[in-house]
Structure formats: C-alpha cells, structure tokens
C-alpha cells in the first residue's frame, strides 16, 4: 500500500451577475464567483489537492482557463474527471479535509449538502469528507467580501 497527501488552494473574486457555486451546490447570494468555469473554489482546491497527491500537476494544467472546452464548465465534472485521472495511476481517495473562508454568505448551513454532493462524485462515504467554514474576522479581501477562498488536504492510496 502506498499513501500520499496533497494540498490545494483556490480563490476567486465575488462579482454581481454570477451564481455562487460551492462544493457542487448552488447557494443563494447577491454575488457569485468570477472565473472561467463556474468558479467553485472548494471543488477546485480539492482537485488541486488530489492532483498534487498523485504528482499529476494541477487543475490549470488539466483544465486550462484558456480552453473553450472548459469555459463555463461545471466543477462537478472537473472533480469527477480528477478522480478518474488519479485512478489511472492506481490511486483512490481516502479522505478530504477542507476549509472555506468567506464572510458571507454563511456556509455552515450548506455543508451537509456539499458533503453529499462531493461523496457521490468521489465514490466515497460522506464521513470521508470534512468541510469547515470560517471567516477572516473582516480582514483582507475575504473580510471585505471581495472574494472567497478554500483550502483542502487529501489522502490517497493505492
């Protein structure tokens, strides 16, 4: 058995006129995240963690923001394809531990739905996915509600 750990991070700017997607679910809010895809920072951080653990570069390499094919892409597809990519090297997900950093909207009420969505895509139990939410106590770009960031650590094995 071989186990590996990966770390991922993502951040996107909050803007008017976009839907807010987090952990694969749509969250009602006056603003959404700006990006080439649906800009789901949680799923993007998780994908980077998975790819990093498998030593398969990063999300931008596999799903470039310069490609018409990835424009407006649903990040659930990116996560599904990332799980398939690490499987080509014989790896499967053991667990994910992630943190969302946002002042508003409050993420905690949505965490059970995020976990259910992600577990279905990853083919694991909801108990294998930990999602936490925090703020920056009004400090920095997140505190000024200019953007949302997410961090993720994952364990994979073969």
Regions found by a protein language model. Give the residues of each.
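N-terminal charge/polar-biased segments
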Residues: 1-3, 157-158
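RNase III-family endoribonuclease catalytic core
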Residues: 2-112, 122
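Short, low-complexity, polybasic intrinsically disordered segments
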Residues: 111-115, 145
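Glycine-rich, mobile lid/loop segments that gate access to catalytic sites or pores
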Residues: 118
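Short acidic capping loops at alpha-helix termini that bridge into adjacent secondary structure
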Residues: 125-128
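Pyridoxal 5′-phosphate
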Residues: 131-135
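Short acidic, Gly/Pro-enriched loop/turn segments at secondary-structure junctions
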Residues: 138-140
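C-terminal edge-of-domain segments
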Residues: 142-158
């Amino acid at each position: 058995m071989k186990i590996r750990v990966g770390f991922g991070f993502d951040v996107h700017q909050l803007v008017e006129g976009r839907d807010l997607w987090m952990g694969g679910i749509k969250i009602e809010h006056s603003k959404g995240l700006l990006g080439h895809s649906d800009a789901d920072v949680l799923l993007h951080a998780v994908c980077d963690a998975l790819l990093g653990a498998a030593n398969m570069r990063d999300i931008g390499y596999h799903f470039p923001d310069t490609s018409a094919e990835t424009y407006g892409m649903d990040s659930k597809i990116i996560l599904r394809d990332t799980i398939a990519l690490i499987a080509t090297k014989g790896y499967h997900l053991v667990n994910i531990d992630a943190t969302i950093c946002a002042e508003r909207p409050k993420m905690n009420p949505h965490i059970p739905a995020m976990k259910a969505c992600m577990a279905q895509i990853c083919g694991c139990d909801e108990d294998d996915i930990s999602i936490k939410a925090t703020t920056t106590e009004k400090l920095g770009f997140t505190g000024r509600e200019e953007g949302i960031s997410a961090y993720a650590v994952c364990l994979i094995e073969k």
